[in-house]
């Protein structure tokens, strides 16, 4: 099995924590570093959340703080979904784990420049860190093997009728990434909403046990409530974790190649990922867009990762 070298760029975040849990444990993934961006909450909060998850699950991977603001737009957060801390629900021990002193953007640039072009970037929050790295050092572009991101939708948005939160939180950054020429895989809402985590899934992970089973339960029981209140969903989708699933085994997710453009014009479609599903524009595809996911396979994968944290001694 090939180990995919990745940098996970996230804004923890409930589903981000599940993505971290999976990426750090599955043997098909070589998690080099975790970079944190503002998104679901402000950077000071998303950083603490990322460090708390690493400390609880003993994820011994360096964590780097990145962009505290979007490139241009006024900052927004998703406190209606993720709560005041950005990771409401779990109770963590006093935090002793610390972030690295290097800025996340510098870490991304330095790591890619020193690589053989075999590192995949996995941004599952706003694309601010990735876009700034691309603008600061364009020489990283040919060094990026692939970008597998959570964001966007070819159908309806979730933060506006047109836009998904991660893209809407920094559309200009998304525009930089989608015009970069780097191979892109997009897990948008059309796919990720298929991973609604219902009470029976939570019970399954509780039965699996260990610190990851406990954390999964605390996290997803909180989003059960907020997702129903905001969207009428029967549970919280684990949006970000689909990217890790794809990297472990892309056969579990059906994708379609499309030309995708991010709308950065002010107006009702600001932040929309315009996906040319039918090819009517005649432009070459720049993105593999997730369409459907084998949910039985996916939840089995999540459980496998949860069980990986159970200590046998």
From Swiss-Prot:
GO cellular component: cytosol
Keyword Chloroplast among UniProt keywords: no
List of residues binding substrate: 227, 239
InterPro entries named among the record's database cross-references: I/U_nuclsd_hydro_CS, Inosine/uridine_hydrolase_dom, IUNH, Pyrim_hydro_RihB, Ribo_hydro-like
Binding residues for Ca(2+): 11, 16, 124, 240
Catalytic activity, EC: 3.2.2.8
Record text on cofactor binding: Binds 1 Ca(2+) ion per monomer.
SUPFAM superfamilies registered for this protein in UniProt: Nucleoside hydrolase
NCBIfam families the record matches: PRK09955.1
Subunit field text: Homotetramer.
Name of the protein in its database record: Pyrimidine-specific ribonucleoside hydrolase RihB
Species the sequence originates in: Escherichia coli O9:H4 (strain HS)
Highest classification ranks of the organism: Bacteria, Pseudomonadati, Pseudomonadota, Gammaproteobacteria, Enterobacterales
